[in-house]
Amino acid sequence: MEYKNTLLMPKTEFPMRGNLPKREPAMQEKWAEMNIYEKVQEHTKGRPLFVLHDGPPYANGDIHMGHALNKVLKDFIVRYKSMTGFCAPYVPGWDTHGLPIEQALTNKGVKRKEMTVAEFRKLCAEYAYEQVERQREQFKRLGVRADWDNPYITLEPAYEAQQIKVFGDMAKKGYIYKGQKPVYWSPTSESALAEAEIEYQDKKSASIYVAFPVKDGKNVLEGDEKYIIWTTTPWTLPANLGISVHPELEYAIVKVNGEKYIIASELFETVAKTLEWENAEVVKTVKGSELEYTVAKHPFYDRDSLVMLGDHVTTDAGTGCVHTAPGHGEDDFIVGKKYGLEVLCPVDDKGVLTEEAPGFEGLFYDKANKPITEKLEEVGALLKLTFITHSYPHDWRTKKPIIFRATAQWFASIEAFRKELLEAVAETKWVPAWGETRLHNMVRDRGDWCISRQRAWGVPIPVFYAENGDPIITDETINHVADLFREHGSNVWFEREAKDLLPEGFTHSGSPNGEFRKETDIMDVWFDSGSSHQAVLEERDDLQRPADLYLEGSDQYRGWFNSSLSTAVAVTGKAPYKGVLSHGFVLDGEGRKMSKSIGNIVVPKKIMDQLGGDILRLWVSSVDYQSDVRISDDILKQVAEVYRKIRNTFRFLLGNLDDFKPSENTVAVAELREVDRYMLVKLNDLITKVKEAYETYDFAAVYHAIHNFCTIDLSSFYLDFAKDILYIEGANHEDRRAIQTVLYDVLVALTKLVTPILPHTADEVWPYIPGVTEESVQLTDMPEAVQLDGAEALKTKWDAFMTLRDDVLKALEVARNEKVIGKSLNASITLYPTAEMKAMLESINEDLKQLFIVSEYKLGGMMEEAPADAPKYEHTAVVVVQATGETCERCWVVSETIGKDAEHETLCERCATVVKENYVK
């Protein structure tokens, strides 16, 4: 008889190798065929809503690791919520207006100047839709479950119509105004930028100290002094109209080399060192407030420079006397306005100086620095020129420096509802908690929001102008434009004349002849995406405002979190979200930013093609995503190894349940052995821990808990000793069915617990599980932790056993290394434990040699009675010797009962009995 045929070895068709790059697309096709998104919505209908609102990625190019991290995190949450009593719809979105699409078309050779704005915009829309399609397929490949057939797209007419309504509501409340004000201006984009569209990079700039002679000392100064200013933007000096000093600072009149200079007293030493003054003496001091209204002379124009008071003046750098050009700085503008100065801005849209800067007209601003510095030197006003490298704002799209420039722009007045904004921030739940401080400070400190852009591809600002120049924004015009956009899309604005965009028969006192103009500026793209709470959450039947959660990268505090908050509070008085969660950026394995120049870019598509979407998702679950995270081949290799461990666990569980019918073979909990009940206690602990981790969005805790459970609780302990029962005993042996009962509970729970993170794998496992009826694990709920009777006492006892078992394993390892035994089944062990452990061992009814995986187990005396040469550990001394007897051909246990049964002379007594009872006819 072939005894190996009498072993109940694991049997399953569940493949050992994941082969995810091939298997996942097939699984996704299956999901599409069964309409999994709709099925889940149907299954969860009537439950409380949980809305995670998708911040729209920009529709341009392939998705990058940041996109993957973001969408997968969202998917974890939505999947978990739909398995824990919520209906969790997920509507993906795309941001589709703005400069990058215009640039992409230009790069493709589109001749912008040779077509009408409307024609160019049609090409932009086509391109945007192509990009949406491209990204949609890549997001689907990640396994993200969403309403992919009904996303929201900011260029769609219904969306644009709602955005116009948001603008109209804000205008009605008096929050929208047109004003001349310095704004961030990008000469390369020829447009104003919002704060969210700038990034800081190092730039080399001229650093100059310039003397402004006093023209009128107002009886405070004698008139022969000179104010010293410091600037790193010499090109703004043609726009200088004043000097700001701080009212509370003390200013020194310093005599040196026959000249008298005015600087802040506390900066005297620094300035003296920089300007290499020797023997400089302070001849007089005055308070800043006394210098108000003194007048200096512009260094190279026949023009006054008024001395004004400003709280923005600091002693961090410079001289305490600040060059003030109201057309080129926010503080300058505010101070200038207070003192009635004009807003002089001698720079055009392209960054070129105009005739208002005589002597420098026609020069690009950055190229004007040198001739202006030379002019200062020529007139004797330049005291020092050096070059510094400093952090300077750049256009986030063109990567080129930007300037502050006063232009006529449309603004949303943040000041008008700042108090409500700050209250809304305080009422929101922020994860991480520092998010609250970050947004609070941004809202507290930000100026009014410049919402106009001088571009073609965007939503037009729905404003008309009367013949007398009055802007027209009324309920009637707003509603009419919104209706037109809903019917025809916003291109209609560029296809029709102003009169054809106004309601029929519209009149206005400022247009006696019935003539009207329309605004040509478009809205900031942050106003587009920032209106999604109205256009999506409020408009869709399956969603609601406020959303439960917004989840984006930490750059969105100044972006989407901010713009959404501003428009929502302006229109509804409340935040559009109850909670905000942010994640960090994805860096390479060494913690460097990914860039083409370094060549360290990791692409999601490559990972999915080589390893699979579930590996990428498992990586997302493994990292501390609230900070910046790292990814590399080595890191992915480690994650793939963890995946292999989890997959093998599933395969082992399935293999050993091949002959298990839950309805027939399940053993009642009360009839399980203690060790089996202990395993159920461990399983319930896992369920509790994992669900708590999901609830708090701590996915790394989910990852570690599941990995540890598979490797430590199952593989290293329970499954290890269970093999001797599962394979060796007869099919219906009570211990075997008891273990299978536990394995079944573990398998079902584990499959559900990993579903949000590994949906492809979980749905691959699901149909192999005996007795399941649901079409997909996604249509089930998370397992519930069951409180077993006496669970705490059981846990205490068996946790103690596990620590003692560690001592035994160490002793067996030593014996193996010393060649006393070959493998643990060759061993006979005698334990000399502590009193506490001895009592615990004596209370165990299970076969301890099975639990220790040895051939013979004896309990000796107390620890102090152990032989002198016996290795002593924390809880026991252990004597390991070679077991006496022969090795059983069937179970490999060393036993003196081999051959006792003449018919089965190579088997131990136990195996002979099993064979006779189950396999001998």
Curated annotation (Swiss-Prot):
A motif ('HIGH' region) lies at residues 57-67. L-isoleucyl-5'-AMP binds at E552. Binds 1 zinc ion per subunit. It is found in: Cytoplasm. Gene3D superfamilies: 1.10.730.20, HUPs (3.40.50.620), Ile-tRNA synthetase CP2 domain-like (1.10.10.830), Valyl/Leucyl/Isoleucyl-tRNA synthetase, editing domain (3.90.740.10). A motif ('KMSKS' region) lies at residues 593-597. Pfam families: Anticodon_1, tRNA-synt_1, zf-FPG_IleRS. Belongs to the class-I aminoacyl-tRNA synthetase family. IleS type 1 subfamily. This is Isoleucine--tRNA ligase. It comes from Bacillus cereus (strain AH187). The lineage of its organism: Bacteria, Bacillati, Bacillota, Bacilli, Bacillales.
